[in-house]
Structures are given as C-alpha cells and as structure tokens.
Amino acid sequence: MTIDDRKIKILQAIINDYIHTGDPVGSRTIAKKYNLGVGSATIRNEMADLEDMGYLEQPHASSGRVPSNKGYRLYVDSLMENQLLTPEENLKIKQYIIDTAMLEVDKIVRQTSSLLSELTNLTCVIQTPSVNKSFIKSLQLMKVDSTTLVSVIITDAGVMKNHIIRVNSTPTIEELNKINAVINRRLVNLCIEQINLQVINQLKEDLQGYDELFNALLTPLYETLKNAADSPDLIMEGATNIFNYPEYNDIEKAKEMLSLLNDKESLRDLLKTNKDITIRIGEENYKPQAKECSIIAAEYSFGNRPIGTIGLIGPKRIDYSKVISIMAEIVKELNNILNNQSK
C-alpha cells in the first residue's frame, strides 16, 4: 500500500493536532478542524490504513490515533512546514547577541543554553569546549597603570580568561613586549593539561629579574589550570521543563527521563552529531531511557572548528517546526559571535 496525497494530508493534520493538544486524534476532529474535502467516514478509513502502514498508533481501543515514530519521521523529513519566529522571539535573540558579544566563551554558552530553554520550553543540554584539552593560543600582559597589569589568556577553543595583576611597579612598554614574547615562546601551543611544575620552573628561569611579576603571573596561570580541571563537561538548563508535558505524568516515564538527565555519559553520546541539525525520534536515540523522547542536536564552532554540541530534549510530540527554527537561528548567531571573537 502506498501513501497517497490524501493520506499525507490526513497524517499531517493528525500530527499537527496531536502536537498542540496532546490528545489522541479522531476522524471527527480532523473533519471539523481541517478542510480536507472529505467526511469523517472516509477519514476514519484512511486513518485505519495509515495505522496498518505503521504511521499511526491507537493507544486504547476506544481512543483516537497518535503518530508513531515512523509517522513523526515522515513528518519531520517531508511534511513539516517552516515556521517564522515571532517578533518577541526575534527581540530576545537580538538582545542575546548584544549581551554576549564581549563575554568569555563559557558565559556565552551558558546564556545560549538559558535562552534556548526559555524559548522552546524544553530541556537544553550543551557540551562545553574541553578546556583542559585546549591549547594556549596567546597569553598577553597589558599595562593598565603604574601598578596594574591585566593578563589575557586565550585558547584555541576561544576560551578567554582575564585577570588583574597588582605589582609595585609595572615594566615599561618595551620590557612588557619582551616579557610577552618570552611567555608566549614558552606557553603558546602547549595543551593546558601539559602546563606542569617543570614548565612553570622553566618560565621562572626565562623571567629572571622579574620575580615579582612572575609570582603575580602564577595566580592567573593557576586559575586557568583550576578552571580547566573544574570545567563542567555539560551545561543543563530547564531540567524541569520536560515535566510540564502531560506525557511525564506517567511515573515510569518520569523516572526514565530523570535517569537520562542524570546520566552524563548517555547524554554525551546522544548529543553526538556531525550535521547542522540532527533530529532523533524515540528509539532512534539508541538509549533505553530516551526511547520516549526526541532529541534535537547541533554543533557549534569557534574559528570554523567544531568545539561543542547543543541538544534539546522533549517529548516526541514537540513542535518540531518551531523548535528547529529557533535552534537554527540561535546556533547561527552563536557561531557568528564565537567566530568574530576568533578574528
């Protein structure tokens, strides 16, 4: 049996209705709400065929139909219509661009997670850049006044750390240029996890005569190493959002979801993607705890190098069109912000 145009229109109407109501859909509902040009009896027969073909399911003998995983997949791949963002959503994204333009990467990522969770009402999980695996791209000391310097440490993943350094007397600009050259010869292209006591002692020898400055420099170096060790691998916002959906009134489904949200290893696996946007529905998620949800994932980049992934987790009946439009726009702006910082 092939799926003809009429069946496709009926399936599309059923999925749209179920996404927005959460109630199993009957033939009368489709006949009343959607102008398909056929009566409820014809729609009922077509729905039976769609169920036989695996696109619909009937949760209870006396209830209407709901989309199956196969039905959702056809909808996402072929039937879903693009949805424009609302003026309010556009305004919030513009404000996000302004607010994050000059922030450090980890703070940008946190704000991105918060905004995505707010606009989609889903749980957002972001895999952060692995700081301890990053390489130092630059470490610069800049003079503020006669007793104050600022150190700026930048990694190849775009993570930037600023620290204020207080000394009795700052070096001259000429001396500072030489000191920066020495520091960068020693540290640039070193992986952060490679900066050990031996490297620190070598740097101390290189900076003989600038003991006060070297000792002051140890603090930002230590903070960078500590942050690398403590840096969270995953950031989660809106963890409770998913429980606003009635699907998770079922205690067993709620337990499965809680188990998933607390399983970082599984979340990292489920976020893997090498595409702009990946949509996995139900059992496509290949983790038992995720078989009743959908996960939408996308990469984000710094300097055109992928450095992390973003995931949205929700029930299978999420508003795919709306969520994908929001995610695509925010990921695009996140990449623009990070790539501008890399220049």
From Swiss-Prot:
Pfam families: HrcA. The keyword Transcription regulation applies. The keyword Transcription applies. GO terms for biological process: negative regulation of DNA-templated transcription. GO terms for molecular function: DNA binding. Keywords: Repressor, Stress response, Transcription, Transcription regulation. SUPFAM superfamilies: GAF domain-like, Winged helix' DNA-binding domain. InterPro entries: GAF-like_dom_sf, HrcA, HrcA_C, WH-like_DNA-bd_sf, WH_DNA-bd_sf, WHTH_transcript_rep_HrcA_IDD. Belongs to the HrcA family. Negative regulator of class I heat shock genes (grpE-dnaK-dnaJ and groELS operons). Prevents heat-shock induction of these operons. This is Heat-inducible transcription repressor HrcA. It comes from Clostridium botulinum (strain Eklund 17B / Type B). The lineage of its organism: Bacteria, Bacillati, Bacillota, Clostridia, Eubacteriales. The gene is hrcA.
